[in-house]
Amino acid sequence: FGGTHPKKPGNQLAADLATSMLEQSWERPPAKKGVPHSIPEKLFNPHSYVKGRFLSPEKAKLEGGWKWSEPEWKKLSGGKRGRYLGKPLLHTAKPGSTATIDFEGSAIGAFVLAGPDAGVLEFVIDGKVKGTVTLGHRYSRGLHYPRSVMFAHDLKPGKHTISLTLSEKGKVEGKTSAARILQFCVN
């Protein structure tokens, strides 16, 4: 699983860094009174996700084949992690179907389950910003892999509307493609 779940050497590196930091901190006597530290007004990276939050897809306006329900997992190939089962999510397997949601912020993405049938989403933000996002990941071939995809990260702060359409481009060898959204990611 790459850098997300390191093997023993990666875990040891993280543990050693934490130990070193704590030991150095404890060498000094504690301050008599704690001082609160706030987040600087001017961030080092203006596109930081410091205001990141989830937005429920339940609020989306659905057209065509989008549904807010639990998919029929038993009919779908690929492994599934139990923590994502038994819950409703926003999903479609019908190319051309559109879901639209309003949000406030400067960035929008989605936390998805990308399985063997993961497709391509076309997006339009405020009728101007357009693009596509491929939902599949190399781990999606045998697993409904949880991952986040970003549609835009540098919007003008404020109110926006995004429309998502399952693309015909995601179909492979006549098989259907799908999109499964657990949460929208907004900053």
Cite the ranges covered by each PLM segment.
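Conserved catalytic region of serine esterases and O-acyltransferases that act on ester linkages
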Residues: 1-187
